């Protein structure tokens, strides 16, 4: 399972629960916090300055499972993963996202499951959907 999905989905659904209980403004506050989480990490990188190519490399680097320690040092997976999870939910809905999660129980490469469920390969999805959205959100939300 890619690190960005594990941490991003946790943030997405956690933020949904908070928003349900305390109002939509809390979702926006939590989203901002998640997106800026990387600033507490030790990379020294500024995601808001990334080019499309740098975003692609960055997202590919978050595909690993990291054996339980999903990106705790640099803290990239939380905000990036939240935004990618928002895109998955917006484009495919809850059912497809749950089908994608269930696919990790199969003896199948997750990239193939992604293509089967979303009808696009992961790299194309990064370039056509995910990266444009992530870049817009990092400009919009400071």
Regions found by a protein language model. Give the residues of each.
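Loop/turn elements at helix/coil->beta-strand transitions in domains of secreted/extracellular proteins
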Residues: 93-96
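Acidic/His/Gly-enriched intrinsically disordered linker/tail segments
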Residues: 1-81, 91, 101-142
């Amino acid at each position: 399972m890619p690190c960005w999905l594990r941490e991003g989905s946790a943030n997405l659904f956690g933020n949904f629960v908070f928003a349900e209980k305390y109002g939509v403004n809390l979702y926006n506050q939590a989203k901002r916090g998640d997106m800026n989480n990387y600033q507490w990490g030790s990379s020294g990188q500024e995601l808001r300055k990334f080019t499309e190519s740098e975003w692609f490399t960055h997202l590919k680097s978050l595909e690993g499972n990291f054996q339980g320690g999903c990106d705790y040092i640099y803290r990239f997976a939380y905000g990036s993963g939240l935004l990618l999870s928002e895109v998955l939910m917006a484009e495919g809905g809850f059912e497809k996202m749950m089908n994608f999660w269930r696919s990790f129980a199969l003896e199948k490469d997750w990239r193939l499951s992604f293509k089967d469920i979303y009808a696009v390969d992961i790299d194309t999805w990064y370039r056509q959907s995910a990266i444009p959205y992530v870049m817009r959100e990092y400009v919009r939300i400071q």
